Amino acid sequence: MKNKRSQNSPYITPNSSYTTLEKALGYSFKDKRLLEQALTHKSCKLALNNERLEFLGDAVLGLVIGELLYHKFYQYDEGKLSKLRASIVSAHGFTKLAKAIALQDYLRVSSSEEISNGREKPSILSSAFEALMAGVYLEAGLAKVQKIMQNLLNRAYKRLDLEHLFMDYKTALQELTQAQFCVIPTYQLLKEKGPDHHKEFEMALYIQDKMYATAKGKSKKEAEQQCAYQALQKLKEAK
């Protein structure tokens, strides 16, 4: 979908209405302003953006996905359930779900973010997905969010189980670099920002003193996992 810049606005906005997005989501917003807020990144510097909704969405999705996994995998102990939830409730997991409904095509971002392909960044896309689900929760309640999430998980994942869903990318990368280069990756904190309840960490990954990836996450561990995933993809492409 092509996006355009309004003459009276500093941000990029989609050409079409949100009807296609709502159809893919399986929910039509009564208050379109709430939907628009959920899709508005802070880079637009508008009075309302999706940060507060993102905060609520994080809590709502943690509960919804936790309950879904609790009932679906009755044979799993707390440790396995935590791993499953962590793989979905993450920037990588929410980005995957967001792309299942082409959410990136509807984000409102600044012109500078548009130039840097910001609408494809996991940190921006996953936050918008959390905000979108918070909007659904505020209008239609928890049951509707549960129904939407069940449908999206079925669409985004061919199989929803521990073996196919959870991947420790850091461990996989370490095993690969030890085999290929006889070294292990190192991680460095580049930036830490935000209040204590809403931290964002940016990490860099190095292999033999060469930077292979940078990524952001709500914890150092999540950002490191994202870095490891990127590095694995680069090493696979280089083969």
Curated annotation (Swiss-Prot):
Classification via Pfam families: dsrm, Ribonucleas_3_3
Domain RNase III per the UniProt entry, residue ranges: 18-141
Catalytic center residues: D58, E130
Domain (DRBM): residue spans on this chain: 168-237
InterPro entries reported in the protein's UniProt record: dsRBD_dom, RNase_III, RNase_III_dom, RNase_III_sf
Keyword ATP-binding: no
TM regions (residue ranges): none
Subcellular localization, as worded in the UniProt entry: Cytoplasm
E.C. no: 3.1.26.3
SUPFAM superfamilies: dsRNA-binding domain-like, RNase III domain-like
Family annotation (NCBIfam families): RNaseIII (TIGR02191)
HAMAP family associated with the record: RNase_III
Subunit structure: Homodimer.
Protein function: Digests double-stranded RNA. Involved in the processing of primary rRNA transcript to yield the immediate precursors to the large and small rRNAs (23S and 16S). Processes some mRNAs, and tRNAs when they are encoded in the rRNA operon. Processes pre-crRNA and tracrRNA of type II CRISPR loci if present in the organism.
Protein name: Ribonuclease 3
Natural source organism: Helicobacter pylori (strain ATCC 700392 / 26695)
Gene that encodes it: rnc
